[in-house]
Amino acid sequence: MENLVFVSAQPDVQYFHWQVKVYVHNFIEKGINPNNIHVIFAIVNKEKKPTEESLKLKEMGINVHHYVDDRFQKHYIPNIKPFLISKWLKEFPKYGKCFFLHDADIIFRQLPNFENLLNDDI
C-alpha cells in the first residue's frame, strides 16, 4: 500500500475545504502516509489564484494541487473531476499507474485490504 496514492478532485470552495480536512485527518489516523494524499482543486469563479484556505491544507503534510478551471463547458458540474485528474496526470504522469480516486466526503471506519485489490487481475 506504500505506493498507493489517494486522490480527490473538487472545486476550490469552502464547502470542500472542510470535507478535505475531515477525510485527511481520518486517513492519517488510519495510518495513511500524508505524503500519499493528493488533493486537487479547481480554481473557479473567475479567480486567478488559489484560496488561502486551500493553501493552508498543505500544513497537514499533504500534497495540494491547483488548476484553473478552463473547461469550455461548465454546465455539467461532475465533469470537473476527470478534467482535474487529466491536468494532474499531465503534470505528474508517474502517478497514473495506480491511484485511489475518491470523493471528498469519505471517511474510513477501517481501511480496506488494498493489497488484495492491487493484486487482483480484474
Language model: regions and residue ranges:
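GT-A fold catalytic core of metal-dependent nucleotide-sugar glycosyltransferases
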Residues: 79-122
